[in-house]
Amino acid sequence: MASKKVQKIRDKRKARVRAKISGSTERPRLSVFRSSKHIYVQAVADNEGKTIAHSSTISDDVKSKITDVKKVEAAKEVGRSISRKLRDMGIQEVVFDRGSYLYHGRVKALADGAREEGLKF
């Protein structure tokens, strides 16, 4: 786990980011969670309080494609997966919620993968 100082900085950053963005049914919030081994993403409609779609490195559709790849490449595939799911539902635009994480590394790779599949931020 991160040190108390780092966690406090992350909490402040998360509050600052979340205060500025909100998702709707037409344009959901794409929320990212990153652990040491996996990355998770979900599309949330804040006006309804529901998760519309989700994907992660432990999802069956992604897990089969990411054997023997680095974490950044796995994150990119998760981004492609969530983009395909949302496109099938007729959603073209989202609001990207990086949470408390810097837009760098796996978080950036996830966003790039989603953009490659045609999702607009």
From Swiss-Prot:
A GO molecular function annotation here is: structural constituent of ribosome
Species:
Syntrophus aciditrophicus (strain SB)
Superkingdom per UniProt: Bacteria
Q: Name one GO biological process term.
A: translation
User: Which keywords does the record carry?
Assistant: Ribonucleoprotein, Ribosomal protein, RNA-binding, rRNA-binding
From the record, what ranges are coiled-coil? none
Cell division as a keyword of this entry, yes or no, is: no
What's the protein name? Large ribosomal subunit protein uL18
InterPro entries listed in its UniProt record: Ribosomal_uL18_bac-type (IPR004389), Ribosomal_uL18_bac/euk (IPR005484)
Q: How does it assemble?
A: Part of the 50S ribosomal subunit; part of the 5S rRNA/L5/L18/L25 subcomplex. Contacts the 5S and 23S rRNAs.
* Bias (Basic residues) ranges: 1-19
Ranges for the region named Disordered are 1-23
**Family of this protein:** Belongs to the universal ribosomal protein uL18 family.
Role this protein plays: This is one of the proteins that bind and probably mediate the attachment of the 5S RNA into the large ribosomal subunit, where it forms part of the central protuberance.
Q: Which HAMAP family match?
A: Ribosomal_uL18_B (MF_01337_B)
Q: Where is it found, in Gene Ontology cellular component terms? A: cytosolic large ribosomal subunit
Q: Does the keyword Cytoplasm apply?
A: no
